[in-house]
């Protein structure tokens, strides 16, 4: 019985503290052993191991997919409250433009926020920065899932 190729998209590396456990180089080796044609790294608010991961995948003959779980603040009508509630949007680069946009958004998430809040961007920060990106919205930490779970169907 033959299996259709499977591509894991939601792997957090050891660079995502307290959540990921695998070294990006080991991820590539394991992907080859398991017969995956491609594998994605998606660290939280970071691209820390992206270059190491891409090089290791290429050495193993595996297609690397670079992504991140980007924190996106929920809009708030209360002044000073934006950034207190952050949902996560998995974003993946499909080309060089997408990688450039990922780098910009991750940098913005860290540099343009109050230090008391976790790294995030505002939804409007995505405007003009979506070329070459693929977004998944069904994650358990995503806005749609969380809003539905909170009974806010009209906002989801």
Task: Identify what each model region corresponds to.
Residues 1-156:
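Phosphodiester-processing cores and adjacent nucleic acid-binding clamps
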């Amino acid at each position: 019985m033959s299996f259709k190729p499977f591509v894991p998209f939601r792997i957090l590396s050891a660079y995502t503290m307290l959540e990921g456990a695998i070294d990006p180089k080991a991820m590539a080796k394991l992907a080859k052993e398991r017969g995956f044609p491609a594998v994605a790294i998606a660290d939280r608010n970071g691209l820390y191991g992206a270059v190491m991961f891409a090089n290791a995948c290429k050495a193993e003959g595996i297609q690397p997919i670079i992504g991140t779980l980007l924190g996106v603040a929920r809009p708030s009508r209360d002044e000073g409250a934006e950034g207190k509630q952050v949902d996560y949007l998995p974003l993946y680069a499909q080309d060089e433009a997408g990688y450039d946009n990922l780098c910009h958004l991750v940098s913005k998430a860290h540099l343009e926020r109050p230090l008391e809040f976790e790294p995030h961007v505002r939804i409007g920060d995505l405007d003009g920065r979506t070329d070459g990106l693929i977004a998944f919205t069904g994650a358990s930490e995503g806005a749609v899932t969380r809003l539905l779970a909170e009974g806010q169907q009209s906002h989801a």
